[in-house]
A protein has these predicted regions:
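N-terminal secretory signal peptides that target proteins for export/translocation
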Residues: 1-7
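Bacterial N-terminal signal peptides
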Residues: 9-20
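Short loop/turn segments at strand-loop or loop-helix junctions that form parts
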Residues: 337-338, 371-376
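Conserved C-terminal helix/tail region of periplasmic/extracytoplasmic solute-binding proteins
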Residues: 357-362, 367-372
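Periplasmic OmpA-like peptidoglycan-binding domain that tethers envelope proteins to the cell wall
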Residues: 364, 374-439
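Short coil/turn segments at beta-strand junctions that form active-site/ligand-binding loops
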Residues: 25, 222-223, 365-367, 405
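Flexible loop/hinge segments at secondary-structure junctions
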Residues: 24-341, 346-350, 356-360, 425-429, ...
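Hydrophobic anchor at the start of a short beta-strand
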Residues: 236, 369, 406-407
Length: 439
């Protein structure tokens, strides 16, 4: 049964509101500070301008990290609330029907999915929407000579087991830790990808609600190290990060967009599926459109609009792979998979459409594509080869069903990993299909 709140807003959108109810917000977005600080207001401003044809103004509510966007629609006032108090607060608001859209800088947890199961499946394509990619940047002072750390060493630093920069190749100086607060999806992501249940954050860490404030403080502290969304890196220096034996990578346009960077993460909007607010679904479609993704790029995050890159020569790449791709550019898309080994995930389903649009815009066809599947390390090399081939075939079949016939697809087994072999996170990242396009 629709809530009273949703019913009143339906009345508002029909312009039959009773006196005294005109202050109801047309939409409410609650959750991640990473999304809500800048990205969500920018996206909503663009959406409202397109919807109404009128200017949009932003004003504070009097509560920290909250913004109201105001415009008029058919002569009536229209407002949208963006409340950016952390990912977990957004789920609570969505579950309580106090929010139409939950902004999350991590994926929905199993317990959260179960709690909402009677209203919507939050992992379904109708409810789960990847809107951008962010790199969880590891920040140090610009003068710090340390260039890279592996994830285990990074975890030991944040746990306080490594407490002096000289232990990791830096100056003889104590390490000061800066971290996001407990309500933050950024913290949840760091805890999952770095601490990984093996380490606890040192009690001496300074905690922050704001990415930007954390980054600013690290950039002014020669002893400091912290983490924040890539868009909030500011004047801090970025470290390259290695996952296991995989190469260390800095967050860059290609490494983050393809999610090859070990600390790349997806930014999500969640809705109550087809039972949710229709205006929210319109907003989601706007965000996923080329116009919306251009705003994502403008905000400093990584859009999902594909672009092609000529990769420089790399001596670590096997000769067979170099010959396979010598006439191709790397596209900034990796197809990844859901629970099944060959089932494309929700982002990949959208990416199929984006790749198809890229081909149309660039005057190319499926014959110009090369899909290269990869697998995590398996019990037998032939098994990894088979899984990688099935993944490439799965992506080629999905494109063919959309009218794009891909002639070039191949499996490359467990070679060229981008994540630690054998672990859950590494397995998700290593199990991928790279997209290459003929020059």
């Amino acid at each position: 049964m629709p809530s009273i709140r949703r019913y009143l807003r339906h009345l508002w959108l029909s312009f039959t509101l009773l006196p005294g109810l005109a202050s109801a917000h047309a939409l409410e977005i609650h959750g991640s500070n990473t999304i809500g600080a800048t990205l969500a207001p920018m996206l909503m401003t663009g959406f409202l301008q397109q919807l109404t044809g009128n200017p949009v103004t932003a004003r504070p509510t009097g509560t920290a990290n909250e913004t109201v966007l105001a415009t008029s629609y058919n002569g009536k006032p229209m407002t949208v609330l963006v409340a950016a108090h952390g990912t977990s607060t957004g789920f609570s608001a969505l579950a309580a029907d106090h929010a139409d859209i939950w902004a999350a800088s991590r994926r929905v947890k199993g317990s959260e999915r179960e709690a909402m199961a009677t209203r919507a499946d939050l992992t379904s394509p109708a409810s789960e929407h990847v809107i951008a990619i962010d790199g969880l940047a590891i920040l140090v002072h610009p003068s710090n000579p340390v260039e890279q750390l592996n994830i285990d060493t990074l975890a030991r630093v944040f746990a306080g087991e490594i407490s002096n920069w000289s232990e990791v190749g830096g100056p003889d100086r104590p390490i000061r830790i800066y971290a996001r607060d407990e309500q933050s999806g950024t913290w949840d992501t760091f805890k999952e990808l770095v601490l990984a249940g093996r380490y606890n954050l040192t009690p001496s860490a300074q905690r922050y609600e704001s990415n930007d404030q954390l980054s600013n403080d690290v950039s002014n502290d020669p002893s400091g190290i912290g983490f924040a969304g890539f868009a909030s890196a500011g004047n801090s220096k970025l470290l390259a990060i290695a996952d296991g034996n995989a190469p260390a990578l800095k967050p860059s346009a290609l490494s983050v967009a393809t999610e090859d960077y070990p600390l790349a993460r997806r930014l999500y909007l969640y809705t109550a599926g087809n039972t949710g607010e229709p205006l929210a679904r319109q907003f989601i479609e706007y965000v996923q459109s080329p116009t919306g993704q251009a705003i994502v790029a403008e905000s400093g995050f990584f859009p999902q609009t594909p672009f092609a890159v000529d990769l420089p020569p790399d001596a670590s790449v096997p000769d067979t792979f170099r010959r396979l791709t010598e006439h191709y550019q790397r596209l900034s898309v990796n197809f990844r998979f859901a629970e099944g080994r060959t089932q494309l995930d929700n982002k990949a389903r959208r990416d199929l459409q984006r790749v198809q649009q890229y081909l149309q815009d660039s005057g190319k066809t499926g014959r110009d594509l090369m899909l290269i599947g990869f697998a995590d390390q398996q019990s037998h090399e032939l098994r990894a080869q088979m899984i990688s081939e099935l993944r490439a075939l799965s992506a080629a079949k999905a494109l063919r069903e959309m009218g794009t016939r891909v002639q070039g697809y191949v499996g490359y087994g467990h070679y060229m990993p981008v994540g630690s072999a054998g672990g859950e996170s590494g397995a998700r990242r290593n199990g991928r299909v790279e997209v290459w396009v003929r020059r």
